[in-house]
Amino acid sequence: MVAPTALKKATVTPVSGQDGGSSRIIGINNTESIDEDDDDDVLLDDSDNNTAKEEVEGEEGSRKTHESKTVVVDDQGKPRFTSASKTQGNKIKFESRKIMVPPHRMTPLRNSWTKIYPPLVEHLKLQVRMNLKTKSVELRTNPKFTTDPGALQKGADFIKAFTLGFDLDDSIALLRLDDLYIETFEVKDVKTLTGDHLSRAIGRIAGKDGKTKFAIENATRTRIVLADSKIHILGGFTHIRMARESVVSLILGSPPGKVYGNLRTVASRLKERY
């Protein structure tokens, strides 16, 4: 009778569902079992592997010490490294972007298409097409021609600005200037208004024949689009903040005359700054 503490020999069973117990590791035959007589050989092989690992670790250690000697150290003892752009380079990958076009902007997009795609193709070196089936504009980078890593995002912002309702010239400014942004908010984000109250708030922002909107744009050097209850502002960071304050005050019920007075102060500050 076998003692309860004795160990039984493990029997090697082939994996079910595979023909002839074939291995799932291609190129290496690891289905052979190890006999008890081959234990010494296995131990010798392990020792050889350990010595090989020690040799590799020694080579890597010497390589690291050699690389550490080439690092430039400043006066304070801190290492100085070259810029990543010079060492690694800018690698452009195949990337694509799809910008959906609202139905009411499809006709302006078709009419201005001959002026929209040249900046994307010639300046940003992107591949662009208008998909009429899905009503979208598709952009794609090409590593052979595209050089700017942020070209795809710039092109997407340009198309998005046009679909929001901005003029073509104002949208192209996003490609030329890096400090332009678009901020979007709704009237209900400022104050919950419905029915005629909402219509009057939008009317106060626009003014008669767009007079108030143009005054805010000229004073703050921004561009404003009123799309129903949504308001889109294009401009610099500080300019957007000034225009947003004027629009918010109009939504909250401030009379246009008071807003005009604040705009004069804002315009004088901008003239002093620039």
UniProtKB/Swiss-Prot annotation:
Effect of residue 203 to D: Temperature-sensitive
Places the protein is found: Cytoplasm; Nucleus, Nucleolus
KH domain location: 195-247
InterPro entries: KH-I_PNO1_first, KH_dom_type_1_sf, KH_PNO1_2nd, KRR1-like_KH1
Basic and acidic residues bias (residue ranges): 51-69
Post-translational modification Phosphothreonine, affected residues: 51
Record-level GO cellular component terms: 90S preribosome; cytoplasm; nucleolus; nucleus
KW Ligase (keyword) present: no
Gene3D superfamilies: K Homology domain, type 1 (3.30.1370.10)
In-chain residues carrying the UniProt-annotated modification Phosphoserine: 47
Pfam families with a match to the protein in the record: KH_KRR1_1st (PF17903), KH_PNO1_2nd (PF22891)
Keywords on record: Cytoplasm, Nucleus, Phosphoprotein, Ribosome biogenesis, RNA-binding
GO biological process: one example: endonucleolytic cleavage in ITS1 to separate SSU-rRNA from 5.8S rRNA and LSU-rRNA from tricistronic rRNA transcript (SSU-rRNA, 5.8S rRNA, LSU-rRNA)
Domain of life: Eukaryota
Region feature Disordered, mapped onto this chain: 1-70
Quaternary structure and partners: Component of the small ribosomal subunit, ribosomal RNA processing complex (SSU RRP complex). Interacts with NOB1.
Task of the protein: Required for small ribosomal subunit (SSU) synthesis. Has a role in the processing of early nucleolar and late cytoplasmic pre-RNA species. Recruits DIM1 to nucleolar pre-RNAs. Indirectly required for cleavage at the A2 site of the 20S pre-rRNA, forming 18S rRNA, and at A1 and A2 sites of other pre-rRNAs.
Protein's UniProt name: Pre-rRNA-processing protein PNO1
Organism the protein comes from: Saccharomyces cerevisiae (strain ATCC 204508 / S288c) (Baker's yeast)
Gene label: PNO1
